[in-house]
Amino acid sequence: VYHRIIDKSVCSAEAISLKRALFFVFCWIFLRIFIEGVLEAHHSIGFASFSYKSLLTYFLHFPLFYASLFFLLVIIISALLKEPAGKVTKVASIGLGAIILVPLIDWSIGHGFMITYPLRLEPYFMNFLNPFVSLVHIGVSPGQRVVIVFISLLIAFYTYAKTSDYFRALGLFFLSLGVIIIFGGLTTLLAANHPERIFATGGILYTDTQKYCVLYLLLFSTLAFLYLFMLDRGFMRSVCKTLRLERMTFYGGLAIFGFGISLVYKGVRFQVGSFNYLGIMTMFLSLALGYWGLQVFNDLFDVGTDRMTGRNNPLLKGVKRENYRRFSMMLMALALCYAVIINFPASLILYAYLLLGILYSLPPVRLKRIPIVSTVVIAVAVILSIALGFSVYYGGQAINALPAKILLPTLLAVTLGFTAKDIGHIDGDKAHGVITLPVLLYKPGTFSGRLPIAGLVSVSYLIYAFFIPQVITGAVLFGTGTLLYTLFTKRTSELFYFVMLYLFGAYLFYMLIRISPL
């Protein structure tokens, strides 16, 4: 009888759509966070008064914790039971509702407890399953302990419904219980049992909340991509083949470039530390993922051009347009999450970067169709990327704080130099009304036909020498190398131009440090 009831419940849950299941996950998580704030020790809506830190806590830190654990369990169950990840998600989205019981139980027992990550691991691991030992003093409430065991039992029941195997059900019970317990103590484990030292205030990620957020966002990002791969391998393989790593590296690297220059300009010494390195990674990922999201968004409107040029557009290989659009939105949302962890001004800078990228691609505005304007837009995006790195120490003044010796030559040089990116798309752009400078000026068949664009690209390096005379040697070398390559190569490679940009950027950074202040 019980087996039939469980089977019927599982079949009913599997009948819902995946979209609705994910919406349930969203609802349960935020309902739990809301109730926890009101009924646990805080007795306050939102845990604290309105602030940047409280926003991170409510909308990033806690949701990322629950979402990461949810997808981790779904991935484990799906892999071990060889059940489709989508089906497991649908059932798990109903069972996740158990998490709202935690504050209800705690409130009924003692009017709420202060829930934190376990302050010490020994009592947490040794006594978690011992009902006679309280763990409230290390931040673990009775409600948490009861519900974690209950959720593990639900997983065991689901396993039995799918396999009719008591031993596998028992194994999944203990495995899921262990995973949840270890996950709950993950930050204390990473801090070598002394979270008060590792998560102390200071550094690029200044508050403990920012540090917690970046850890769980990195974990969530990894699990989200793994989950999507399990949902639809064909889709993810097609999408990953379109990665433009050289451009993602370029934009992410610009944030690091800006951060490095701001250190020199501000007179701050970089402090070596794991969370400072994670802060640098956070800057990089915010722009790298942001660019990837915009690239996917641009693919939605470049199908005709890509068909002619032979570029790898997943929409030409059967990927559904709606799924591709959602993937673009997901990447942009992840990018914004990384940016807001750096600081609030960084999120506004990235928001402007994304909006600019949307206007660049979206008809009827589609700024990429207009000569000069298209590369001016890219130049502004480059400046925003540098400003994001500046925002760590300059906050809302980041753009105004950019030295004119960087701002002006970058605006001019990128406007001219990025004409090279369109050399390989001339036929497709011409056929679809996208008028770029290469469409107007570049003729690959002759030396004289390649000269105008070769000259523009090489001059872009020399512009820096006009504003910063100390870099004239490097500017001449890089400009000459790019000129010769563009003149004598009929089929140019975009990678060459980006490698030259990376090398010149490193050279420019070195020279700016030597001649500081700017």
Place the predicted regions along the sequence by residue:
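Multi-pass alpha-helical membrane architecture of UbiA-family
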Residues: Y2-L518
